[in-house]
């Protein structure tokens, strides 16, 4: 399971790259999508590699992401009881495990919003115009994507940047 995050905006982007990002539903900065790894996805990632960062997400980070940021129809979070009614999974951990094992696709989660919105990373990005290998932020980062996602899930802050009470 790959986590893909858009790190650069739309200004000055070539049309074919913009179309590819749109197909992946990465229309705004700090949006994340979960994708199953295959040859088509790898080709799309290579095309948009200067505008996104991606890597393999682990179970704990995926559970944290789903629990804190996954929205369902009407921009609602679900409790674990409501999650069981909607999806048949008893907990967010079971849902995360099924996604990682490939038992279900992210698009098969009933009424789930396909894009996960994140806050900007605490401490900021490195350099968005440089690749991750060169000390920047864009491109493939492997399992280090988990650290970035954890920096982008700020506890106590909702999706609109307001403090939760």
Curated annotation (Swiss-Prot):
UniProt keyword terms in alphabetical order: Ribonucleoprotein, Ribosomal protein
Family matches, as HAMAP family: Ribosomal_uL30_A
Underlying gene: rpl30
Listed name of the protein: Large ribosomal subunit protein uL30
Assembly and binders: Part of the 50S ribosomal subunit.
Family under the similarity heading: Belongs to the universal ribosomal protein uL30 family.
An MF annotation (GO) of this entry: structural constituent of ribosome
UniProt key word Kinase: no
InterPro entries reported for this sequence: Ribo_uL30_ferredoxin-like_sf (IPR036919), Ribosomal_uL30 (IPR039699), Ribosomal_uL30_arc (IPR005997), Ribosomal_uL30_euk_arc (IPR035808), Ribosomal_uL30_ferredoxin-like (IPR016082)
GO cellular component: cytosolic large ribosomal subunit
Keyword Ribonucleoprotein: yes
GO biological process: maturation of LSU-rRNA from tricistronic rRNA transcript (SSU-rRNA, 5.8S rRNA, LSU-rRNA); translation
């Amino acid at each position: 399971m790959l986590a893909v995050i858009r790190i650069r905006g739309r200004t000055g982007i070539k049309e074919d790259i913009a179309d590819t990002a749109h197909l992946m539903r990465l229309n705004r900065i700090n949006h994340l999508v979960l994708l199953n790894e295959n040859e088509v996805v790898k080709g799309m990632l290579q095309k948009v590699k200067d505008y996104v960062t991606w890597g393999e997400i682990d179970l704990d980070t995926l559970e944290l992401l789903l629990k804190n940021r996954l929205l369902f129809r009407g921009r609602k979070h679900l409790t674990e009881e409501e999650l069981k009614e909607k999806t048949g999974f008893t907990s967010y951990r079971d849902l995360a495990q099924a996604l990682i094992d490939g038992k279900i696709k992210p698009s098969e989660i009933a009424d789930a919003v396909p894009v996960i919105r994140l806050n900007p990373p605490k401490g900021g990005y490195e350099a968005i115009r440089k690749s991750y290998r060169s000390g920047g932020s864009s491109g493939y980062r492997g399992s280090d994507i988990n650290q970035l996602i954890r920096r982008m899930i700020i506890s106590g802050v909702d999706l609109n940047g307001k403090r939760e009470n």
